[in-house]
C-alpha cells in the first residue's frame, strides 16, 4: 500500500471507531443500529484502504464495548468477530462493485455486507449474551439494513456525487 492508501485507511479507521464509541448506546448488543456501518459501502469504490480501515476501526471500536456495558469477557471476541465480519463484508462489496459506479452493483454490494454481518455477528453475539439465535439474526439484520442498506447507500451516492463534482470543478 502507498502512503496515501495508508493515510486513508487510518482516517477511515479513526472515523469508524470514533462513531462506534460516540454512539456506544446504539452500537452494541443484538438490537443495534451501528451508524458507523453506514460508512462500509464506501469500500465498494475506495477499495483496499477502506477494507483495511473499516476492519481496524471495528476492532478498536468494539474494544470500547465495555463503555456500553458489554460484559468484559465478550469484548475481545466481539472485537475479533466483528472486525472479521467487516473485513469479509467490505472485501466482498469491493469485489462485487469492482470500483464501478453502476447503481445496481453498488446496491448489491450493500446487501452483501449486510448478509455477511448478519451471518457472522448475528450468530456469535446471541451466543455470547445467552439469547436465542433467531433473535441475533433478526436484530443484527434489521439494524444492518437501516445502517448499511439505507443510510450507507445514501452516503455512498453522496460521496460519488461529491467526487464527480470535484473532478469536474463545478459546485
Model-predicted regions and their roles:
Residues 44-54, 70-78:
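Interfacial helix-start motif at the membrane-water boundary
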Residues 1-49, 56:
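Hydrophobic transmembrane alpha-helices
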Residues 21-31, 35, 59-171:
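Membrane-embedded alpha-helical hairpins and interfacial helices in multi-pass inner-membrane proteins
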Amino acid at each position: 500500500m502507498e502512503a496515501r492508501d495508508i493515510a486513508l485507511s487510518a482516517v477511515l479507521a479513526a472515523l469508524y471507531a470514533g462513531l462506534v464509541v460516540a454512539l456506544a448506546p446504539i452500537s452494541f448488543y443484538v438490537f443495534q443500529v451501528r451508524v458507523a456501518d453506514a460508512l462500509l459501502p464506501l469500500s465498494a469504490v475506495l477499495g483496499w484502504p477502506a477494507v483495511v480501515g473499516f476492519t481496524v476501526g471495528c476492532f478498536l471500536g468494539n474494544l470500547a464495548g465495555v463503555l456500553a456495558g458489554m460484559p468484559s469477557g465478550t469484548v475481545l471476541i466481539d472485537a475479533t468477530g466483528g472486525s472479521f465480519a467487516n473485513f469479509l463484508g467490505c472485501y466482498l462489496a469491493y469485489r462485487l462493485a469492482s470500483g464501478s459506479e453502476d447503481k445496481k452493483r453498488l446496491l448489491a454490494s450493500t446487501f452483501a455486507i449486510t448478509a455477511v454481518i448478519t451471518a457472522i455477528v448475528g450468530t456469535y453475539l446471541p451466543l455470547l449474551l445467552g439469547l436465542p439465535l433467531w433473535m441475533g439474526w433478526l436484530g443484527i439484520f434489521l439494524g444492518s439494513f437501516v445502517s448499511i442498506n439505507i443510510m450507507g447507500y445514501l452516503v455512498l451516492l453522496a460521496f460519488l456525487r461529491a467526487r464527480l463534482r470535484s473532478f469536474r470543478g463545478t459546485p
